[in-house]
Amino acid sequence: MNKEVLSNQALKKTHLVSCEVFDRRLEEHLKPSQKKDQQISLNLINTRLWLNDLGQKYNRTVTVDTIPDEAWVEKLNNYDIFWFMGIYLPSQFSANHAKKYTHQYTYALPDINPDKDVVASPFAIADYLPNPHLVESWEAWDKMVKKLHEADKKVYVDFVPNHTAVDHPWAREHPEYFIQGSRDQFLKNPNLYQAIGGQNGQTHYLAHGKDPNYPEWSDTLQLNYGQEVVHHIMTEKLLSLVEHVDGVRCDMAMLLNPSTFLRTWGWTLNEEEKQYIQNHQFWQEAIPKAKAKAQSLNKLDFEFMAEAYWEKDVLAKNFDYIYRDELYKHLVRVARGENPYHLKEHIAHLLECAQNQGQCKDTVYLENHDEERAIKTMGKEFSQAAAALISFLPNTMLLINQGQDEGRTIRPPMQITRSPQEKSDQQLKSYYQNLLQLKQSKLFREGQWSMAKAHGQATNLIVLEVISSDQTIKALVCINMGKNQTQAYVPQQNNYRVISSYQLNKNLYSHLENKETSFNLNLAPYNTELIFFAS
């Protein structure tokens, strides 16, 4: 055997050994990270729908504290936090109001029965007590929370500070807690007010809850934050929740900012009330109190997530997470054919912001209970690429809506208690499982992220780079956001050499031949490929 053959065999043997060493090293870096403050995954659970689904599956009544262990298995594997929506005492007024619009819910339930299927909005809260149809008591609720804590998971619930249900006891007992109008104002604008009989026999005209840019929510009443007592009682409600959960998602949080509240309701307030609002920002005062109570209960990282669409810089001073609806809007526009230039700029901005660990983090999503299903808005293939993109963004919380990870296409109205009949998309379900477990790894959670360069005509290609904390492993996350095949080449990564790749859409792992200068990238439409390097 000549020297050249021996040399080639030696090189092959060395390459195999190198691959084995790399595989072991990569395997270690792809193990789940114990660090839970980056790339967090949150599952939004419509509690009524999920328990109803489980009840049908197991042919028995299922409450929060009697959910079978097997129903938790996939969720515990995929998610860090569970946001239970709609757990509070339901409003009968809201349920009756919703039945007037039964015809609007038939797209989800063609055979809808208004007496059985239509319920109150989860955001028209009659009181911050458990809905007895879902969980008997806070003690029973705490039993479920304890089980999730044992699995190292967290639980969020809603806090809706802007308004109450129309039939909340305060409406009759304490009408002074609400924005009020006169009888003449009620007659001129009956849609804005609700006539409520007080305990003294007097009729009060209480305003419905409102966003300044949209019509009023007719099953709610607007709390008056110009009153010190309202700040106090709502802070007390918030503090009571701290005992039972690990965080709260704060509904329409920006509505309580002084500038927004005055823009919406300033015309109804006296000068003393206006001055009080300007001098007492609710979140600035209430959140530190809630966190102090949490610490006294040994909950050291109680969290606040804001649903907010403006004045985020104000909220960011106190909140831990805020909705990133700008990213969602960029993705929708690209899905509809817009050049992804602005999307790339926005991603670069988010990566830069992630370097500042102290600031409020983003909650990113493709859909939620308000938005249309991602498959409907973006198409199945694009939604997969978009899911990969937002999943790997560092220092964020990824929100996955109930049914999104199964490929559901029908968005359930908030006022129904039975899920639309749909079959799960098994391919999409597997895709999300692979993606969600991959993003939990040490490499992706603990690594340093940045934008990477790829050369060529790949307009729709987005490449993210992550380097492991010990700098021995590097990965490029290459995502084709377009409908055409994408080709590009990636320069050699300094002291790193490419060894393997993982095609997320195919769940296919492959060894790659070493390249000294660069390697060619050839991505199918809407596909994601991860290229791994070793130092």
List the predicted regions and their residue ranges.
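Active-site and adjacent substrate-binding regions of carbohydrate-active enzymes
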Residues: 2-535
